[in-house]
From Swiss-Prot:
InterPro entries: 4pyrrol_synth_GluAld_NH2Trfase, Aminotrans_3, Aminotrans_3_PPA_site, PyrdxlP-dep_Trfase, PyrdxlP-dep_Trfase_major, PyrdxlP-dep_Trfase_small
Modified sites of kind N6-(pyridoxal phosphate)lysine: 269
Annotated GO CC locations: cytoplasm
Main localization, broad class: cytoplasm
Pathway assigned to this chain's UniProt record: Porphyrin-containing compound metabolism; protoporphyrin-IX biosynthesis; 5-aminolevulinate from L-glutamyl-tRNA(Glu): step 2/2; Porphyrin-containing compound metabolism; chlorophyll biosynthesis
Disulfide bridge map: none
Known catalytic reactions: (S)-4-amino-5-oxopentanoate = 5-aminolevulinate
Name the record gives this protein: Glutamate-1-semialdehyde 2,1-aminomutase
Localization of this protein: Cytoplasm
Isomerase recorded as keyword: yes
E.C. no: 5.4.3.8
Source organism: Chlorobaculum tepidum (strain ATCC 49652 / DSM 12025 / NBRC 103806 / TLS)
UniProt xrefs under HAMAP family: HemL_aminotrans_3
Record-linked SUPFAM superfamilies: PLP-dependent transferases
Length: 431
């Protein structure tokens, strides 16, 4: 068990000045118990905490570090920009054009793109744009999907909202809640029923094509195809939230993987290379409704800042040049197979879901295809599993309902260590 003396001291101090002692709820370890760990340094696939303990990292800053932490090319590019260009101007810069052009080349749905500062900003802006473009008010999302902390999305949401045990948030007005309609993931009939009940009122359907905030739940391809057909027939804007799965499950995201093209796409995480960033884009005739071309307002003081764009641009260049996706698939598949073999040895039959280098081990024997099946998972057992892995130097998400990210920086030795630790942790979790 790692000694966490300094982390415990810092957490006590933090609680005096920061609500709950953290700046994002899942970091508080409420669902797994114990002391939140304060990190001091990251390098490659490893993190070191303030007490000097080192961990093999499968959180990767919640997704951005597909190449690992402190990749030398990304770090060098950030340093060059910091020393030679600057941190922010509040004016247009050439880097904005370069990354926008590259994103439009990579992502199938993008004809135009707008940079913002977070995934939440991206999804909020995309929904506002869809409403402005269609002149309709209501949106459809899916139970358990998380699209950031905008008011419209905190109705039956996933991520930290689900981790806290309450999928809705106080502070969301009744009017907002009434305009947010929730369907069942992977169930096209539930979507059709809502559309028929709200004929001519639905502006957009927003979905994570690989849900990553209820654990990991892949959409069925036929479900996404049916959504595309329904949106075309009803004049509804289809939005893929690829903040998490974009550039991770494939270079062009889930829309490349599944071969289904949305009208709008939201992005983040990987395109910031570890710095705060987001983006939304899509069909030109929709994007042209954004100010200053159109009347749908969206703005940001630090949008398109040089540091974030530099980190994202260098990360994308590496992904294009080195094509790590076959190797990422091999590594993630090795872990999946190892975990499965361990469960077979122990007579366990827990559900594993994986798409590329995003994965989740659910402590339930129920196949997990939507929110209702996800919450059959035994969170108490996951808490025991989490702490056993932590004791063995493996850092996982401190919540059953988050993804495990494999990175290009994980070595075969790291993977073998993880499989061995998984066996011990499964034993500990099921005592």
């Amino acid at each position: 068990m790692p000694v966490l003396t300094r982390s415990a001291e810092l957490f006590e101090k933090a609680k005096k000045f920061i609500p709950g002692g953290v700046n994002s709820p899942v970091r508080a370890f409420k669902s797994v118990g114990g002391t939140p760990i304060y990190m001091a340094k990251g390098q490659g696939a490893y993190m070191t905490d303030v007490d000097g303990n080192t961990y093999l990292d499968y959180v990767g800053s919640w997704g951005p570090f597909i190449l690992g932490s402190m990749h030398p090319r990304v770090t060098a590019a950030i340093e060059y920009t910091l020393r030679n260009i600057g941190t922010s101007f509040g004016t247009p810069i050439e880097l904005e054009i370069e990354i926008a052009e590259l994103l439009c080349k990579i992502v199938p749905s993008l004809e135009m793109v707008r940079m913002v500062n977070s995934g939440t900003e991206a999804t909020m802006s995309a929904v506002r744009l869809a409403r402005g473009y269609t002149g309709k008010d209501k949106i459809i999302k899916f139970e358990g999907c998380y699209h950031g902390h905008g008011d419209s999305f905190l109705i039956k949401a996933g991520s930290g909202v689900l981790t806290l045990g309450d999928p809705d948030s106080p502070g969301v007005t009744k009017g907002t809640a009434n305009d947010t309609l929730n369907a069942t993931y992977n169930d096209i009939e539930s979507v059709k029923a809502i559309v028929n009940e709200n004929k001519g009122q639905v502006a957009a359907i927003i979905i994570e094509p690989v849900a990553g905030n209820t654990g990991v739940i892949p959409a069925k391809k036929e479900f996404l195809v049916a959504l595309r057909e329904l949106c075309d027939a009803e004049g509804i804007v289809l939005i893929f939230d690829e903040v998490m799965c974009g550039f991770r499950v494939a270079l062009g995201g889930a829309q490349e993987l599944y071969g289904v093209t949305p009208d709008l796409t939201t992005m983040g995480k990987i395109i910031g290379g570890g710095l705060p960033v987001g983006a939304f884009g899509g069909k030109r005739h929709i994007m042209e409704n954004i100010a200053p071309l159109g009347s749908v307002y969206q703005a940001g003081t630090l949008s398109g800042n040089p540091l974030a764009l530099t980190a994202g641009l260098e990360t994308l260049k590496i992904l294009m040049e080195e094509n790590p996706y076959p190797e990422l698939e091999r590594k993630a598949a090795f872990l999946e197979a190892g975990f499965k073999a361990n469960m077979e040895k122990l007579g366990l039959n827990y559900t594993q879901n994986r798409v590329g280098s995003m994965a989740c081990l659910f402590f339930t024997e129920t196949p997990v295809v939507d929110y209702k099946s996800a919450i059959t998972a035994d969170t108490a057992k996951y808490g025991k599993y989490f702490h056993s892995m932590l004791d063995q130097g493996i850092y996982l998400a401190p919540s059953q309902f988050e993804a495990m990210f494999t990175s290009f920086a994980h070595t075969d030795e790291d993977l073998e260590k993880t499989v061995k630790a998984n066996y011990n942790a499964l034993v500990a979790a099921t005592k």
